[in-house]
Curated annotation (Swiss-Prot):
One of its GO terms (molecular function) is mRNA binding. It comes from Schizosaccharomyces pombe (strain 972 / ATCC 24843) (Fission yeast). InterPro entries: Nucleotide-bd_a/b_plait_sf, RBD_domain_sf, RNA-bd_8, RRM_dom, RRM_RBM8. SMART domains: RRM. Keywords: Cytoplasm, Nucleus, RNA-binding. This is Uncharacterized RNA-binding protein C23A1.09. It holds the Pfam family RRM_1. Residues 10-87 form the RRM domain. Signal peptide: none annotated. It is found in: Cytoplasm; Nucleus.
Amino acid sequence: MRPAKSVEGYIIIVTGVHPEATEEQVEDLFADFGPVKNLHLNLDRRTGYVKGYALIEYATLEQAQKAVDEKNLSLLDEKLEVDFAFLEPPERAPRPSISTRSRSQSPEVQHRDRDVAMAEP
């Protein structure tokens, strides 16, 4: 499957982010692959700590691919896993038709009891 483009670029998901990591630390690390257009760290409302993942957007597929291809990333002694956040679904081959009879040729079903009941006053 191919990475899907968002409105403005390509979004990667980074998992394994340390709960005390800051946006600045994450952005500094991932700026090595190209300018970061957007960065989102989801925080736990109760604790205020990072929930363990980040979404990072790059302008080009090449920049995002460099980040995904890097296998030795870590931050605050936590190993990071990186992948594309959105993928395009695979193209489907057209399905062969099961029936050769068109719907307009289907036999007409009559409901005599219902027709009689509806005709009565």
